[in-house]
Each structure stands twice: as C-alpha cells, then as structure tokens.
Amino acid sequence: MAFLSSLLLTVLAAVVPIAAPPAGGVADYQLGGAYRPAPKVDVVVRDRTEKPVPGVYSICYVNAFQTQPGTLGWWRRNRPGLLLRDRQGRLVRDAGWPDEVLLDLRTARKRAAAARISRRWFAGCADRGFRAVEPDNLDSWTRSKGLLTGAHARAYARLLVRAAHAERLAIAQKNTPQLNGRRLGFDFAVAEECEVYRECGAYTRMYGRRVIEIEYTDNGRRAFTRACRARGGRVSVLLRDRDVVPRGTRGYVFRTC
C-alpha cells in the first residue's frame, strides 16, 4: 500500500506540474466578491471560499498569518493556543483590520500546527481547481507589538511553501519585499501599492516578470500611470478600488495598462 501511495504521488507530480501565472498576463483581483472576469483576463485571484474560473489561471487567497474575518470563533473553539496574545493576555489584532487576530508563530510546534491548517485549506483550493495560493499577511510580525520577528515569518513561510508544493500549487509572496521570497521558495509575487512605496524593483529583481502589481484608487491615479509606463509591458499591473468590490457594485474600479 505504501508503495502504491508513493507511486500515485509520483504520477500525480508528473501529470500536474507546478506552474506560476503567465508572465505579464492580464490579472483581476476579486477578493471582495467573485464576478465574471473580462474576456481579456488571464489570471484571477479569489478568496478560498470561492470557485476558480474555468479556463483562467486562478489563484486562491488564504489569510495564512492572521485569522480571516468572521472566523475568530472557530479559532477560539478549536485552536485557541495559536492566537497571539500580548503580555496582558489580550489578543493581538491587526490595527487596520480589527477582525483579524495575528497567529502565534513563535515556536516550531505552533508553526507546524498552523501550517497543517493552512495545508488543509491549500488542499481544498487544489481540489476545486485553483493553480496557486496567495497566503496573506507575511508581514504580520511588523504589527505584533514586538512579539513576532521576521525570523518567525521566514520559518513559517518555508512550511507554507512546502505545503503548497505538496498540493501541486504555485505559491505567491504577498508584499513584504524586505524578505527575499525566492530564497524561501515562493514562485511569484503579488505586490500591493509597490509603486506608491517605491518597492516594485525589489519584486522584479527577485521574480522577473512573475509579478502581479495592484495599485489602488484611493492613492490617486498617478501611481498607476507611472507603473504602466515603467512596467506595464513586462508584468501584470492593475488598478482596483480599495474594497475590491464586484463589478456592478458602487465604487467598483478595474483598469489594466
């Protein structure tokens, strides 16, 4: 039986290669709700609770370093020890997203436990037909009140890379250019507002054309215009409204170079 299982995994690896998104393909970022992408779209990013788009390279968004909004009750019931608490015992929340609590990644044991949960989510993404995963909040240590470090993030990221590749999924480095994601094993990058913060060069040096750049309307249109002039012919650059709402919803914006 063990031999057959090993043989099956070997065959699966040969049949389902790990492939990064098409370099420079037109991408759409649909985290606020799924909708039919425009015909020109080659790549779409959707939440792990959604379905992939048939015929379009689909990336599965997973909040891997913090709790997903609306799931804190599940974590409290099932894995309370993986929720980061400060020295007074209070949950450490992302100030920008107070529904999200940081995961406690300070020990190898906790990182392994969190990675097992993420792998189950990755497996669900793969089973539904997604080709890649985007684990968010790699930079959670910068909001941890000094409780987490970049070393904790790197160690956990390596586990996520192994988990994704075991499921035959490519995996994205989400933001955090100060960490060399290529050395950690990431296959491509999803970079938000890198033109605004002058970080895009760090991503293209690491990943070449395998970069999906998202600029947001609340920063104005100039950053998007500059990004298109600088990189629009080489990497995926798109403009979205901050809430990434579905098409047909008030405030919806989607532009590409």
Question: Across the structure, where does each feature detected by a protein language model lie?
Answer:
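Secretory targeting and sorting signals
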Residues: 1-20
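Glycan-processing catalytic domains of CAZymes
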Residues: 15-257
